[in-house]
């Protein structure tokens, strides 16, 4: 839930920050993109360390980075400081998200993996919904800085909880010195009722993996397709979540109504994610995700072009969230299944990182496109088009039956 709030806190605060500092749309776009840029670097640069030091260690490190970034953001005095601190916070979120995705996937069986990932990633829209509700109260009573302070406080609380309760990945421990981790593995196996779980006495050292490995012949097609899927989906998704509240306010709605649309979008996302997770036990996750991406195009076009009442507007926002966030859950389910344990977080991190680059470009480009005079309704069509590419790319991915 933390990443949902931390990522979107700038979107919730955008109108208030722009008013206080008299910012242009393009400057707001930079602030919205700064955190996403940090997430991209964190996913690409920090995430691979989870394949070296462990998933748990990286999650704890990233939680500390997020906490510092959020508290410092609350004290920022100008747009440059805030952009830099949003970048720092994004570093932590990017590394943590990739490590957690691998950790949950590795603790899930093949039948329930889709639902497990759906539950994990539903924390994002839940955090966004909760954050949106809290933001309405905090903005009205304490100003935009209180949003960042609240986020920092929530992150700080999670550090000791994660330290005491978060387990290390068995898959990761099996890659190193098994004798060193024998007791930990045995205790985890016992907690999971794997009574007959046996540990080989031979040590299987992980083969050194690099980003070049992702493009070897056996991974190349799937790697390129998952990269395209992440980039295009994040490009469209972060336009929607970053700009929808502000565009609605600019169109005449109140700030509360604009934030409410963002909340409805995330609520639809939770339903879409859970339904996709349920269906993955019966249908191929690549096919389901491709269909979700295609239907996302139609939902964005309808939202942009239709002349809707307030109630219809909120319903269509929910529909966009249903398909966009549902498709995102599909990608998070697919990515871990492409790579072996020794390469898994590196592969996931690279895919998420490239996706974040799309997410960086979207809010930034949207600011300049809107300044150029493009109508708000037309902007939804422009940013829906990449989803067609994503749908085709994900359809091409071929997965093995098990998570090796």
Where do the protein language model's features map onto the residues?
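Glycine-rich segments within core transmembrane alpha-helices of 12-TM secondary carriers
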Residues: 114-140, 154-155, 352-362
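Central mid-sequence intracellular linker of multi-pass
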Residues: 144-204, 392-404
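Conserved MFS/SLC helix-loop-helix module at the cytosolic interface between two early adjacent transmembrane helices
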Residues: 41-79
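Interfacial helix-cap and linker-helix signal at transmembrane-aqueous boundaries
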Residues: 17-18, 49-50, 134-142, 248-249, ...
């Amino acid at each position: 839930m933390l990443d949902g709030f931390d990522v979107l806190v700038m979107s919730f605060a955008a109108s208030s920050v722009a008013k206080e500092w008299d910012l242009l749309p393009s400057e707001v776009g930079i602030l919205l993109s700064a955190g996403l840029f940090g997430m991209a670097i964190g996913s690409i640069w920090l995430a691979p360390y989870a394949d070296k030091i462990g998933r748990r260690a990286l999650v704890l490190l990233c939680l500390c980075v997020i906490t510092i970034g959020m508290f410092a953001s609350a004290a920022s005095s100008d747009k440059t400081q805030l952009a830099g601190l949003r970048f720092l916070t994004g570093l932590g979120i990017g590394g943590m998200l990739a490590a957690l995705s691998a950790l949950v996937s590795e603790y899930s069986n093949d039948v329930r993996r889709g639902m497990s990932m759906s539950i994990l990633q539903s924390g994002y829209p839940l955090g966004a919904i909760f954050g949106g509700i809290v933001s309405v109260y905090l903005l009205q009573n304490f100003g935009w800085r209180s949003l960042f302070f609240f986020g920092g406080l929530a992150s700080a609380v999670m550090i000791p909880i994660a330290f005491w309760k978060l387990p290390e990945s068995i898959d990761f421990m099996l890659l190193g010195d098994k004798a060193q981790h024998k007791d930990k593995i045995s205790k985890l196996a016992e907690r999971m009722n794997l009574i007959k779980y046996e540990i080989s006495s031979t040590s299987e050292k992980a083969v050194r993996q690099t980003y070049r490995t992702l493009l070897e012949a056996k991974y190349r097609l799937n790697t390129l397709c998952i990269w395209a899927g992440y980039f295009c989906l994040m490009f469209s998704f972060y336009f929607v979540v970053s700009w929808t509240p502000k565009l609605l306010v600019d169109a005449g709605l109140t700030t509360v109504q604009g934030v409410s649309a963002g909340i409805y979008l995330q609520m639809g996302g939770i339903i879409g994610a859970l339904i996709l997770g349920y269906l993955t036990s019966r249908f191929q996750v690549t096919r389901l995700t491709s269909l979700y991406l295609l239907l996302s195009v139609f939902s964005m076009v309808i939202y942009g072009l239709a002349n809707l009442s307030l109630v219809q507007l909120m319903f269509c926002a929910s529909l966009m969230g249903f398909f966009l966030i549902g498709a995102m859950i599909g990608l998070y389910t697919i990515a871990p299944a492409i790579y072996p344990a020794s390469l898994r977080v590196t592969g996931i991190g690279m895919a998420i990182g490239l996706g974040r680059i799309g997410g960086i470009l979207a809010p930034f480009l949207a600011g300049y496109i809107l300044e150029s005079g493009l109508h708000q309704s037309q902007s939804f069509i422009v940013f829906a088009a990449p989803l067609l590419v994503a749908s085709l790319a994900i359809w091409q991915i071929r997965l093995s039956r098990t998570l090796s």
